[in-house]
A protein has these predicted regions:
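Short beta-to-alpha transition helix within the HATPase_c
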Residues: 1-11
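Conserved short strand/loop->alpha-helix "switch" segment adjacent to the catalytic nucleotide/phosphoryl-transfer site
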Residues: 16-35
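Glycine-rich nucleotide-binding loop
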Residues: 76, 116-123
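Short beta-strand/loop element within the Bergerat-fold HATPase_c
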Residues: 50, 54-64
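Glycine-rich ATP-binding loops of the HATPase_c
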Residues: 108-118
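Conserved ATP-binding N-box helix of the HATPase_c
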Residues: 29-51
Length: 128
């Protein structure tokens, strides 16, 4: 997954991760890669220009579901519209956020996003 994202060693983002993915998943490999790839791409963009950028990724099984958590440093408070986080990109396209939401909906999963000063967290649970 990391080789298909914007994480480059020269930009200085500290990345901590732990991943233990079960062999049998209901989510397709394509959807899982799109989901994790977009989560990481968004985290990398949020870290741009920060003095101490970091990303933490955890993938495992929790309560008999696939649990994915991405925590990253951020300088911005992410905007919301009707309780949904929206993109901060020019043009407000937010294709990554839409793709993440579509994959979670497709598999009848759960997504939780939290934004506090200096940190953004996305947690996703998908049925196994």
């Amino acid at each position: 997954v990391f080789q298909h994202t914007n994480i480059k060693p020269d930009i200085g983002i500290r990345v901590d991760y732990k991943a233990a993915c079960p062999a049998n998943l209901t989510v397709s490999d394509i959807d899982l890669c799109a989901l994790i790839g977009n989560l990481i791409d968004n985290a990398v963009e949020a870290c741009e220009g920060l003095a101490d950028p970091y990303i933490r990724l955890y993938i495992g099984v929790l309560k008999n579901q696939l649990y994915i958590s991405v925590t990253n440093a951020t300088k911005d408070t992410v905007r919301k519209l009707d309780s949904e986080y929206i993109t901060t990109k020019r043009g407000n396209h937010g294709h990554g956020l839409k793709r993440i939401n579509l994959v979670v909906e497709k598999y009848e999963g759960y997504i939780n996003r939290q934004n506090e000063p200096g940190v953004f967290v996305t947690e996703i649970m998908l049925p196994l």
